[in-house]
From Swiss-Prot:
It comes from Mus musculus. The keyword Signal applies. PROSITE patterns: TGF_BETA_1 (PS00250), TGF_BETA_2 (PS51362). InterPro entries: Cystine-knot_cytokine, TGF-b_C, TGF-b_propeptide, TGF-beta, TGF-beta-rel, TGFb2, TGFb_CS. This is Transforming growth factor beta-2 proprotein. Glycans are attached at N72, N140, N241. Interacts with the serine proteases, HTRA1 and HTRA3. Interacts with ASPN. Interacts with MFAP5. It comes from the Eukaryota. Disulfide bonds join C309-C318, C317-C380, C346-C411, C350-C413.
């Protein structure tokens, strides 16, 4: 009896002490915003391996179209990936490389019929072949972080089937008659008659191989799931002995003659719609001087086991909006695009880790012994983050970089 009374007495006295042991001090929203803005300033410079902002130079009157094209493609790709992750309830990988990646765009080469060259595409009823020249990037083979193949699917109102499953293959160099001639990469179900859309495929392994072995670069093959039969995507049913042609049409691959034979007005309209939608590769490379820093000091992974489902209540931990205007908030003129972005931040109260009705003094004592400098109550921190693409100038040289973990999308108590 005396033991129970003593335990209760100690518990009531130790719990308030535990609740006060927090390294997360209460700040007003203005102070949160100021700290977040300064943190972003340091983040951007750090990720670009800059000790200070580049010197101010007069902004160019007009950014070259090819530079804008790379920026737009990279930005759109990131937005598409974010939308897919949100739809699938997936999170960005927490072990994303910290430093910024340089982005390069390689368009599919176009050859005139009169040129004595192998055309980059071949028309076949059941597949298309696409080739890229990546020889200029061979010296950077070891720095490749990611490669994406992007192709724009055109609307085909004359398609005989509404849906098709298309597959992407890497064409292999055959050593003998028994060796495989292609390697599967990915597949997508597309709506042939729907409005056009960009399709993206992760081709990092294939491009990495091409950069190290030039003779193995035989291109990609876009084909039907089963050209010798008919595949019904809605129920994964295959109808044998019924050939199905590739009804999906792709900008820069399928000629305008597919849509109009002799109709100059329609040909001109189609060319206008497909302008700027050439199939291309987006290569993301980590420069050597950043690669060395990345290998020497890896960031710690964010803990994922302490996630807290926060409520959207003003006083509780939740996502707070914060728009950063580079010129107004940071005093920077050297970032050309975007002019600003929604950085956001996390703030609010978190429920305490211990309470008098769920924990005992021995547990609290053990925790404090193991983690003497740790907070006894959780803090509101970021959980899901997304990258940001920027276009900036160093002198007269335009550069496009992808900065990881710059946009806070959700929060947790940890």
């Amino acid at each position: 009896m005396h033991y129970c009374v003593l335990s209760t007495f100690l518990l009531l006295h130790l719990v308030p002490v535990a609740l006060s042991l927090s390294t997360c001090s209460t700040l007003d929203m203005d102070q949160f915003m100021r700290k977040r803005i300064e943190a972003i300033r340091g983040q951007i410079l750090s990720k670009l391996k800059l000790t200070s902002p580049p010197e101010d130079y007069p902004e160019p009157d007009e950014v070259p179209p090819e530079v804008i094209s790379i920026y737009n493609s990279t930005r759109d790709l990131l937005q598409e990936k974010a939308s897919r992750r949100a739809a699938a309830c997936e999170r960005e990988r927490s072990d994303e490389e910290y430093y910024a990646k340089e982005v390069y765009k390689i368009d599919m080469p176009s050859h005139l019929p009169s040129e004595n060259a192998i055309p980059p595409t071949f028309y076949r009823p059941y597949f298309r072949i696409v080739r890229f020249d990546v020889s200029t990037m061979e010296k950077n083979a070891s720095n490749l972080v990611k490669a994406e193949f992007r192709v724009f699917r055109l609307q085909n109102p004359k398609a005989r089937v509404a849906e098709q499953r298309i597959e992407l293959y890497q064409i292999l160099k055959s050593k003998d008659l028994t060796s495989p001639t292609q390697r599967y990469i990915d597949s997508k179900v597309v709506k042939t008659r729907a409005e056009g859309e960009w399709l993206s495929f992760d081709v990092t392994d294939a491009v990495q191989e091409w950069l190290h072995h030039k003779d193995r670069n035989l291109g990609f093959k876009i084909s039907l799931h089963c050209p010798c039969c008919t595949f019904v995507p809605s129920n994964n049913y295959i109808i044998p002995n019924k050939s199905e042609e590739l009804e999906a049409r792709f900008a820069g691959i399928d000629g305008t003659s597919t849509y109009a034979s002799g109709d100059q007005k329609t040909i001109k309209s189609t060319r206008k719609k497909t302008s700027g939608k050439t199939p291309h590769l987006l290569l993301m490379l980590l420069p050597s001087y950043r690669l060395e820093s990345q290998q020497s000091s890896r960031r710690k992974k964010r803990a994922l086991d302490a996630a807290y489902c926060f409520r959207n209540v003003q006083d509780n931990c939740c996502l707070r909006p914060l728009y950063i205007d580079f010129k107004r908030d940071l005093g920077w003129k050297w970032i050309h695009e975007p002019k600003g972005y929604n950085a956001n931040f996390c703030a609010g109260a978190c429920p305490y880790l211990w309470s008098s009705d769920t924990q005992h003094t021995k547990v609290l004592s053990l925790y404090n012994t193991i983690n003497p400098e740790a907070s006894a109550s959780p803090c509101c921190v970021s959980q899901d983050l997304e990258p940001l693409t920027i276009l900036y100038y160093i002198g007269n040289t335009p550069k496009i970089e992808q900065l990881s973990n710059m946009i806070v999308k959700s929060c947790k108590c940890s």
